[in-house]
């Protein structure tokens, strides 16, 4: 699902789940997303509302695909977002860096790039 479609679904009440690692979440995220790292998803899926659609994102697409499949297998209406967080940013949609401030597109890209360079390999 493309980022603009995801935004529309979220506006209509869908849940947005970020399955990236803690350091990625800290660097920047989509405002309003719930952070459920992939390695914690099985134990924390109960935090999600089964009555509302779930859209899952990560950095590039593979983790969110796995998470969406796992959630669908557990009875959720779950869909991965195409292109991950970079596609969201490229679509000009807002990101939220640490501290709760929703950055403009260019600001968020700078934050993400700086964090990516300083992240452990």
Regions inferred by a protein language model and the residue ranges of each:
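Short, surface-exposed ligand- or partner-binding patches at beta-edge/loop junctions that are enriched
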Residues: 57
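Rhodanese-like catalytic fold shared by cysteine-dependent sulfurtransferases
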Residues: 1-15, 22-53, 64-121
């Amino acid at each position: 699902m493309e980022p603009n479609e995801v935004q529309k679904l979220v506006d209509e009440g869908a849940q947005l789940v970020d399955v990236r690692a803690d350091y990625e979440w800290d660097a920047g995220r989509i405002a309003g997303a719930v952070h459920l790292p992939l390695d914690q998803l099985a134990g924390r899926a109960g935090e999600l509302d089964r009555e509302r659609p779930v859209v899952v994102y990560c950095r590039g697409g593979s983790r969110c695909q796995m998470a969406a499949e796992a959630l669908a297998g557990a009875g959720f209406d779950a869909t991965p977002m195409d292109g991950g967080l970079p596609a969201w940013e490229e679509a000009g949609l807002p990101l939220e860096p640490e501290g709760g401030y929703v950055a403009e597109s260019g600001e968020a890209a700078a934050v993400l790039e700086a964090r990516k360079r300083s992240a452990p390999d």
